Amino acid sequence: MITGDFAEALVLYWLSKHGYECACVDHTGIDLIAFKKDGSERMGISVQGRSRYPGTEKIAVNLHQFQEARVPCELFGLIPHAAIVVDGGKVIRCFLLPLDYLETIAGGKKVRVWPMTERFLEARRNDQKVRWFELAEHAQSRWW
């Protein structure tokens, strides 16, 4: 619950920071709606957040059923997207991409997954269809 709420809030913040109008809708299949003010882009976003314990950072993320996001997006005239937020210990990664494209690159057969190998992540960083950002812990702190 905490990880999911954090992931949704982080995606909302980042989209808003970059000029999108956003709303948390918590509708079956989608969590967020975001659109450009000029109306040129309207997204229904299913957010998937995962936290990782030390040593488990490379474990793939199991993905939601894609069809659940398509139904409300069709009803509301939105393009279905997925946001995948993963806490990898010293870095939090967020990826945002169209669901149609995610289906072509997601691994797995029965259960679809987002691999967390460095090779896969580097390919996504260089992929023009994937928007992404990383928050890294570089500064010193006194936080436990």
Language model segments and positions:
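Mixed-charge (Asp/Glu-Lys/Arg
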Residues: 1-28, 34-144
